[in-house]
A protein has these predicted regions:
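Pre-NBD coupling/linker segments of ABC/ABC-like ATPases
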Residues: 2-12, 103-169, 173-176
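ABC-family P-loop ATPase nucleotide-binding domains
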Residues: 1-35, 46, 159-162, 166-168, ...
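Hydrophobic anchor residue at the start of the ABC signature
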Residues: 40, 68
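Walker B catalytic motif
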Residues: 26, 53-56, 63
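ABC ATPase nucleotide-binding domain signature region
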Residues: 1-10, 86-118, 178-227
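Conserved signature/switch motifs of ABC ATPase nucleotide-binding domains
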Residues: 46-48, 77
């Protein structure tokens, strides 16, 4: 894909710049983040007058989002760019003006007038576009401070010993741990570091090479991708 829009030397140089490490892998062996970076690289490498990026931060971890946002911002200094994005922080960083889209899903959509970035973001959160005197949502979007959870959780629901799993050249190792009943447990980390593999082992979708998860609980699993 990349060599269709640029020379192999330029592709290699650009891949190093965006930490794209899976140039020689088959598509079905590449993570969503790597696929996203590949698509972004193909767009950036092409010589054009107008560049479109449709949700460029999807599937990217925090560090990668910052890197790609910086590259799109640099591109915007000499080219014209249109970005579709859900991440308001990314939009605030890369754009000069914003159109707000609103309407009814699968029924109709309306494109607002062009707004200054800060006005657009505030209007979107408020649910009201003052410049057009239009309410786009019944309620505001508010960010609430998360308070530490207290209460009834404490019983061990799932417990595991040291786990390991090898998949091709990649090896995942996890220390022994547990999940308490009623707990909301987060997993965070860079793309292609094994987050999905770890969760698949806990959900008993994937069998570890080392260690065994001994539990008879019922599991409902939402995968990263739908096959």
């Amino acid at each position: 894909l990349l060599e269709k829009v640029a020379s192999s030397d330029k592709v290699s140089e650009f891949a190093e710049k965006i930490n794209l490490t899976s140039l020689d892998k088959k598509l079905d062996k590449v993570s969503g983040g790597e696929l996203q970076k590949g698509a972004i690289a193909a767009t950036l490498l092409k010589e054009a007058d107008l560049y479109f990026f449709d949700e460029p931060s999807s599937y990217l971890d925090i560090e990668q989002r910052i890197l790609i946002a910086r590259m799109i911002s640099e591109l915007g200094e000499k080219k014209t760019v249109v970005v579709i994005e859900h991440d308001l922080a990314i939009l605030d960083y890369v754009t000069d003006n914003i159109h707000i889209m609103y309407g009814s899903p699968n029924a109709y959509g309306i494109v607002s007038q062009k707004l200054a970035v800060r006005n657009a973001i505030n209007s979107y959160l408020e649910g009201y576009i003052q410049e057009s005197n239009v309410r786009i949502r019944d309620s505001q979007i508010k960010f609430l401070k998360h308070s530490p959870r207290t209460g009834w959780y404490g019983e061990i629901l799932v417990k595991w010993p040291k786990l390991s799993k090898k998949m091709g050249d990649f090896k995942l190792e996890a220390k022994a741990g547990e999940i308490l009943r009623g707990q909301v447990l987060g997993v965070v980390g860079g793309n292609a570091t094994g987050k999905t593999t770890f969760v698949k082992m806990l959900a008993k979708v994937l069998k570890p090479d080392e260690g065994e998860i001994d539990t008879e609980i019922t599991v409902s699993y939402k995968p990263q991708y739908i096959d």
